[in-house]
Curated annotation (Swiss-Prot):
Protein name as catalogued: Indole-3-glycerol phosphate synthase
Keywords: Amino-acid biosynthesis, Aromatic amino acid biosynthesis, Decarboxylase, Lyase, Tryptophan biosynthesis
Entry's Gene Ontology molecular function annotations: indole-3-glycerol-phosphate synthase activity; phosphoribosylanthranilate isomerase activity
Taxonomic lineage from the root: Archaea, Methanobacteriati, Methanobacteriota, Thermococci, Thermococcales
Superkingdom per UniProt: Archaea
Gene3D superfamilies assigned: Aldolase class I
Length: 229
């Protein structure tokens, strides 16, 4: 694990910084693996130029597996972001012990505990991606010492069953101080979506769109290498 490896890679990236999510299941679209080897998809993401890898460990809604997260961290030199509904500091420690580089902390879940969870994660060498969906949540997030703030274009409270779009990034990202790395999450399916996202954010996190296609390497490469004016 490289300390704060994800935020550093985003800052140094010379192409479009895309965090590619290895998403095995979606409450909206169902099975996204469709019999494919997840490690082969990882290799495709690496070849396409992903700036980092994201994996959801939640088993209930997204059918994630923490043991596979640990394996991912060993299989790739890219920084790996753990996404889950984290509510205990023990989960943060487990993430660091597994070799993770970053952890998602959801403002809506943690509320007034958010600052101490951010500090705890950073003490363990983890980047923190503090997730927001509303202006009220953003006001809380910018008071923390997080390295990154993520704008979830979809409502995680609805388990991504809503049709979010990058207009929320356009609305909230300009309000985030420059000391934070800004990440646009979810709802990015086309090059036009990506252009809007990266006009306002420093990086984009894309999962479903990549997993739904038969050739995730080709699509991701087109996103990474696209000219963003």
């Amino acid at each position: 694990m490289v300390i704060f490896g994800l935020s550093r890679r985003i800052k140094r990236c010379t192409k479009n910084p895309i965090i590619a999510e290895l998403k095995v299941y979606s409450p909206k679209y169902g099975d996204l693996l469709r019999g494919r080897d997840p490690l082969e998809i990882l290799r495709r993401y690496e070849r396409a130029g992903a700036v980092g890898i994201s994996y959801i460990t939640d088993p209930k809604y997204f059918r994630g597996n923490f043991d596979f997260f640990k394996r991912l961290c060993k299989e790739t030199e890219l920084p790996v972001l753990r996404k889950d509904f984290i509510t205990t500091k023990e989960e943060i420690e487990k993430t660091a012990e597994a070799g993770g580089s970053a952890v998602l902390l959801i403002t809506r879940l943690l509320k007034d505990k958010l600052p101490e969870f951010v500090d705890h994660a950073r003490e363990h060498g983890l980047d923190t991606l503090v997730e927001v969906h509303t202006l009220e949540e953003l006001k809380i997030a910018i008071q923390t010492n997080s390295t990154m703030i993520g704008i979830n274009n979809r409502d995680i409270g609805k388990l991504e069953l809503d049709d979010g779009n990058v207009s929320l990034t356009a609305k909230l990202a300009p309000l985030i101080p420059d000391k934070f790395v800004k990440v646009s999450e979810s709802g990015i399916t086309t090059l036009e979506d990506l252009k809007v996202a990266l006009k306002y954010a420093d990086a984009a996190l894309i999962g479903t769109a990549l997993m739904k296609t038969e050739d995730p390497e080709k699509l991701l490469k087109s996103f990474v290498e696209a000219k963003i004016c």
